Structures are given as C-alpha cells and as structure tokens.
Regions:
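Cross-family detector of peptidyl-prolyl cis-trans isomerase
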Residues: 2-8, 17-169
C-alpha cells in the first residue's frame, strides 16, 4: 500500500512538471537576452543609416531630430507633447494622435508618477519644439512584468514632439 501511495505521488509530481514544461514551451515570451540582441540590432541599423545616437546617464538612447529652443525640461515642469509609441519591430502601440486631430497633446508634470523612468529621463534632453526619438530599454520601462499590451522585456521606441514646457513655479 505504501508503494502505491509513493508511486501515485511521484507520478502526480512528474505529470505536473511535464505539463508545466509544455505550457512554458508553447508560450513565446521575450527574454532579457533576446531583448538585448534585438536592441543591439536596432541601434546598429540606426547607426548604419547615419543616425547620431546619444545616451542619457540612465541608459535611454535618443536621436535628436530637431533640437528645439530654450531651456531643457526639468523635474516639476508641465510638459505638453505629441508622441507615437512603437515596439522595436515597428508596431505602433499608442499615440497621442490616435482618433483625434494632429494637434493632440499629452500634458503631464515631469517626474510625477506614474510615468516610466525612461520616459521622464528622455524628456530631460528636450527643449520646446524639439523632436526626438527615444529608445527605452525595458529596464527603464516595464521590465520583466510588462504592462497591459506591453510584453515583458520589451524595448519601447517613442517619437516625441515637445510642444510646450511650462516651468515649475
């Protein structure tokens, strides 16, 4: 009787382990290593096309398309931007322009949660009327968890136009 009980427990555990392995293999998830490979390929392609890529101290990559004028955005400033957000494969996941006029803006206070770290960091390299492409690694975005339609370990690419900077009073 003891042998049958032990056999049942071992068989059950092995069945559960086998089933969980099948489920893991059936789901294609981006890993951190895959993200880094894809990011490197993306940056290499941008450089090969003549883009000058800079990096913030935290690790956000950016390309200044139009420098803009005035002072750089600072924590506490109220910013108005137009943006389009893409996955690194070019698929758009969001835009301030979707479903509205081309003059739509997204207004927020810089460094005021719930922004992602890479977004806030990227805003600080922009002046009024600047246009910048931000390339934000997942470690500065939604990381290993993802969020909503953003999968885990997903580099985010934003094209941002800084429409206005209202300094903190």
């Amino acid at each position: 009787m003891k042998k049958a009980g032990i056999h049942f427990i071992v068989t059950t555990i092995l069945s559960i382990l086998f089933a969980s392995c099948l489920k893991m293999n059936d789901i294609k998830e981006n890993t951190e290593a895959e993200e880094l490979i894809n990011l490197n390929k993306y940056l290499t392609k941008l450089q090969a096309n003549g883009n000058d890529i800079d990096t913030t101290t935290s690790g956000v990559y950016y390309i200044t398309i139009n420098e803009g004028t005035g002072d750089f955005a600072r924590n506490g400033d109220t910013l108005s931007v137009g943006y389009a957000g893409y996955f690194i494969d070019g698929t758009m996941f969001g835009s301030s322009f979707q479903g509205s006029s081309k003059d739509s803006t997204f207004t927020f206070i810089l460094d005021n949660p719930p922004s992602i770290q890479g977004w806030d960091d990227g805003m600080k390299v922009m002046k009024k009327n600047a246009k910048t492409q931000l390339i934000i690694p997942s470690s500065l975005a939604y990381g290993s968890e993802g969020a909503g339609i953003i999968p885990a370990y997903q580099t985010l690419v934003f094209v941002v136009v800084m429409k206005n900077i209202k300094p903190e009073i």
